C-alpha cells in the first residue's frame, strides 16, 4: 500500500526541560487525561509562562517508528527582532485561530482523488484521513473551549469543495449539537472501500495500519460542543471555488449531485496530468466532461449542490451572527476585548485561481479602518498571506503606515510561519498557521500582553482533543507520505510557540 509511510522521523522539535520532575508530572497528567486537558489546567489570565496547549505537552514520535506518543511541550521562545525582551505585566486580549479545516464530503462525485498519484500540486487531492475532517474540527473546538478567549477566528477553507452539505456540517459543528456527517447512502461509498482494487488508496479495512470499521464509524452521528467564544469567519478559496480553483458551472453542479464517481484516470489522462498538461482548473473541467477513466456508482444526494460565492458568504455571515447584506466581499471589523481591533480582509478570488488577491478598493477601505481603530492595537486576518497575494504589497504598505498594527495572521499555506516585518511604525509580525486537515492538525492560540517596553504577542499551538476519532485522523495524517510531516508543515521551533515583542508606538517615519 503506497500511501502510508511507517518510517516516520520525529516531526516535532522538543525543548530541553527545565526540570526533569516537572515534565515527568506533566507527561503523566497528559497521558491520563489528554494533552488538551492539560491546557485547561495550565492556562493563566496573568503573565505566567505556563499557558498550556503544546507549551505543556504534545505528540511526538520518539523512536521514529511512525507511532505518536505523548511527550514534553515547547515553552515560548522569545523573539526580539522588533523589540527587546521585557517583563510581561498583564493580558490585553486572548483569542485563537482555526484554519483550513477542509470539512469535506469524501463520497462526493465532485472530488478528484485520482490526481493525487501525480504528486506535486495535486499532492493533497487524497488524504488517508479525509473521512474524519468533521470530527477533527469538533475536537479542535473542544480543545479551544478550555481556554478563556475573547474570540475565535476561522481563517478560511472551512470546507473543501463549496458543497451545501459540507457547509451544513461545518457550521453545525461550530454551532454545536448532534452532527450527521453522512451523505448519499448510510454505508460508505468511496475510493477507500475494501472493494476498490486500486492499491494507491488507503483502505482501512484491509491496509496497514488496519482500522476495521473506521469508514462506517466515520459516517455515524457525533456530538460537537460548539464554539464557546464568539467566532468570526474569513472566507477561503475552497469555500467559494470548485476544488478551490474555479467558479461552479452547470457542468460541475451536475457532477456534484450525480451518481458516478471517478476512481482512476485512463492512461492518456494520467499521462497528461503527470506531464503538467492538467492543472487545477483543468481538473474541474475534467470532472465535467466525460470522466475519462474507471468510475464507481454512488448514491446521489441533492444536498451536495454547489453554492454560489454570494450564497457562501451570506451563509457564513448569518452563522456567525454578523447579519446579512454586507456586500459581495467578506470585509469587516470587530473588537477583541477593549484594547484590540480586528480587521478581516477578503483575499479570495471569485472567478478562478487559488492565490490570494487584494483589490485596490480594499486597500482604501483598509486605510480607513486603520484610522478608525484609534488607540486600539490592530490585528489583521486574511486567508491567503498578504505577502504572497496579488495586490498584497499595497495592503502591507498600509499596515506599515500604522503605529498600532501587531500582526497579520493568515492560513491557506497549511504551514506554520512567524516572520518579522520592519516598518516605519516600528514593525509587526506576519503569521501563518498550519491546517487542521494535514499534520500536525493544530489550532493556534494568542494573547496580547502588556510589557515594560510596550506589548508582546504570545502565540502557541493547541492539539485537538484526544478522545474521539480525531485522534485516529492525526495518526493517519502523520503517516501520510505526501502530508504535513514530510513537507515540514509544522515549521521550525521559531514558527510555533513564541513570544513576539513589539516596541511602544512611535511616530511613523516617512
Regions found by a protein language model. Name each.
Residues 154-175, 204, 216-219, 242-256, ...:
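Metal-dependent catalytic neighborhoods of phosphoester/phosphodiester hydrolases
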Residues 97-99, 151-157, 227, 232-237, ...:
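Active-site neighborhood of phospho(di)ester-bond hydrolases with catalytic His/Asp-centered motifs
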Residues 3, 10, 43-145, 150-151, ...:
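Metal-dependent phosphoesterase/phosphodiesterase active-site architecture
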Residues 104-105, 160-162, 239-244, 351-352, ...:
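Active-site environment of divalent metal-dependent phosphoester hydrolases
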Residues 349-364, 368-410:
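Active-site-proximal segments of metal-dependent phosphoesterases and phosphodiesterases across multiple
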Residues 1-19:
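Terminal targeting segments of Actinobacterial cell-envelope proteins
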Residues 31-42:
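Hydrophobic alpha-helical membrane-insertion segments, chiefly the h-region
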Residues 14-30:
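N-terminal Sec-pathway targeting helices
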